[in-house]
């Protein structure tokens, strides 16, 4: 069993965040000894899932719903699966958008490196899009995809 301070340190979270999660009902089986929260392996695993879902952009109210479904048992497996599939699709879309942004940055870094070498943008502008070097053409095309 771990104290709230130990868990906060393990996960790199403020103690206030763990208290908030507890108040939101995200640790339904959390034990208390003389008013002190005691985190076991179940809560640590729940916290790993909570942090994953938060990083995936899920709101606390939806995480709470997921945790409630977990306590309801196997009958909620289909709901949980749909929730994760929807979040996965959302993340895949976000990753694609981020990759387009990254490719634009790669292209612009290359573009300005060429402009600096030439002392002008004239030559590099004339290369776009057909005569770009292969190593940068894919980044340009992905960045400009609609």
Which stretches of residues belong to each language-model region?
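Short linear sequence elements within intrinsically disordered, low-complexity coil regions
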Residues: 7, 25-26, 44, 71, ...
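C-terminal regulatory/oligomerization modules of transcriptional regulators
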Residues: 75-146
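Basic helix-turn-helix/winged-helix DNA-binding cores
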Residues: 1-68
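A generic structural signal for secondary-structure junctions
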Residues: 52-55, 68-71, 110, 114-117
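Amphipathic alpha-helical dimerization/coiled-coil segments
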Residues: 55-87
